[in-house]
């Protein structure tokens, strides 16, 4: 089963400490080597590059960041191929433990979502 983990936090924290980047890189290396992590990526703050395209009352609007009204913004993601939801939660907990250890005072969350299996298009 494929799962996506989505890390969210307040935008005002700035960039993570280098020690956290290093620890996340090591965790990612291990998960990639054992075949459980398929993809991962971090996102720049919305004040650097952030745009929202929205439909509201049938109208499309485009808004440039930063998004002052947002309580949390997505900071990154990972896609895993795992056997169960429990394994996905374990991966998220390990990731959050690194934040707790290397970025004291940071507050945020990691959301775990199972991905849909989409059938291939028919010819």
Which residues make up each language-model segment?
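Conserved, structured core segments of small domains
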Residues: 1-123
């Amino acid at each position: 089963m494929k799962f996506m983990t989505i890390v969210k936090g307040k935008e005002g924290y700035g960039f993570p400490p280098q020690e956290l980047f290093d620890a996340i890189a090591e965790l990612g290396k291990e998960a990639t080597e054992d075949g459980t992590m398929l993809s991962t990526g971090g996102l720049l703050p919305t004040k650097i590059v952030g745009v929202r395209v929205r439909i509201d009352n049938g109208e499309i609007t485009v808004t440039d960041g930063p998004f002052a009204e947002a309580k949390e913004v997505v900071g990154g993601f990972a896609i895993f191929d795992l056997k169960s939801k429990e394994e996905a939660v374990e991966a998220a907990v390990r990731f959050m433990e690194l934040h707790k250890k290397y970025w004291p005072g940071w507050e945020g969350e990691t959301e775990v979502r199972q991905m849909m299996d989409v059938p291939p298009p028919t010819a």
